[in-house]
Amino acid sequence: MSRYRRPRFKKIRRLGALPGLTSKRPKTGNDLKNQSRSGKKSQYRIRLEEKQKLRFHYGLTERQLLKYVRIAGKAKGSTGQVLLQLLEMRLDNILFRLGMASTIPQARQLVNHRHILVNGSIVDIPSYRCKPRDIITAKDEKKSRTLIQNYLDSSPPQELPKHLTLQPLQYKGLVNQIIDSKWVSLKINELLVVEYYSRQT
């Protein structure tokens, strides 16, 4: 299954705010009316919508998300918490959380077009898993720095999560630690996502 490329507003009307996909937000009043008209949701639909919310926010294919769920299931600790940590530590998401890109799709383009270095080396894989003490910088070229400066200027002001540090004048971000789940920017019940996949197997 491919990544979602159709109009984004339809998704946020149904699933709620998806900051990684778009900065647009649904009109709350209309959405509540639509939801009440649609009647009570089944447990399956509730789990499905949480899964879709996670997938669209991080810009993953169904196969990619399933792979992350399986990796999280084999790790120590809560599967849902580990799943969120894996997704939050992706390079494209780290760039988004730093404000060096306005959305995760924009961050993915920066990485794909080789504008980003990790610890001094170009990384062109958006799913690259960042680690504590990683240093993320823009390539030392005018085009790369101009792109990132534009994103930094246009990104809505928000509190930087504690696991990251931004040095905007140097176009540099630092990963201080693995993210704590309370700093995840998406409102999500990750246990419902894990339940969704456990019932599919």
UniProtKB/Swiss-Prot annotation:
One of its GO terms (molecular function) is structural constituent of ribosome. GO terms for biological process: translation. InterPro entries: Ribosomal_uS4 (IPR022801), Ribosomal_uS4_bac-type (IPR005709), Ribosomal_uS4_CS (IPR018079), Ribosomal_uS4_N (IPR001912), S4_RNA-bd (IPR002942), S4_RNA-bd_sf (IPR036986). CDD domains: S4. The keyword Cell wall biogenesis/degradation does not apply. Keywords: Chloroplast, Plastid, Ribonucleoprotein, Ribosomal protein, RNA-binding, rRNA-binding. Its main location: plastid. Part of the 30S ribosomal subunit. Contacts protein S5. The interaction surface between S4 and S5 is involved in control of translational fidelity. One of the primary rRNA binding proteins, it binds directly to 16S rRNA where it nucleates assembly of the body of the 30S subunit. With S5 and S12 plays an important role in translational accuracy. This is Small ribosomal subunit protein uS4c. It comes from Cucumis sativus.
